[in-house]
Amino acid sequence: MVSQTEWLGYCLCKPGAWQDEPGEGDVVAKVGDKIFAFLGDGSAIGLKCGDREAADLLLDRYRGAASKTAYIGQHGWNTFTLDGTIPPDEMRDLIDTSYRLIVAKLPKSKRPA
């Protein structure tokens, strides 16, 4: 099973990515000024999955290991457990998608080179 620290390291290897702690115990990965991964307490990771329809397809695919993210789920964010249920290569794909979606929303001047 991959640890939260290892997933955070994977997130931070992305161009322009950096770690922030906007609240006590809240660990997030950002690109520019936008969050692309919520790592929280290490038991789960919140990721942008596209529009709500795309996010709902992932809820069906990972039933029991994924849920709509509180407060922002209606905007296409899901939370995925980090208990090993989701294979590491698929989790990397989910992180890559979240990063790519967030970078696409950044103004061109703030996008990583």
Mark where each language-model region is.
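Charge-dense, helix-prone N-terminal extensions
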Residues: 1-113
